[in-house]
Amino acid sequence: ILTVDPNNSETLYLGTDDDGVYKSTDGGESWKKLTVSSLSKSFGVGDIIVDPQNSNNIYIGTVDYFRLSESRGVLGDFGIYKSTDGGATWEEFNVGLNHLGVFSLELSEENRILYAGTRAGGVYWISLDD
């Protein structure tokens, strides 16, 4: 998943299948891995949204995955996470989701509603003005 900041085309966010989120502030020349402290070091990203009204507000939908290693399997974390500081820190934003894998996010600018499409087939929404 590649998302361009709608207010700065040099700022890009890259979500991976099982290695988290990366950020570039130079149009993709270099990348920095973002740390989401409440998630495991490796997690899958279903979608990334940058708020067009405030580029510091970023939402990621994380997806569940199962990775096999030589000794065991590991179930990944999933849900919605929000940053209000351009990706420096993150908090869980799973109001009503009960940790469902999120594969799609859409933000209605007019209504300020964030929609989340889940693995379970449902669509959830939350007002960002609350």
Task: Put a short name on every predicted segment.
Residues I1-D130:
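Extracellular glycan-interacting surfaces
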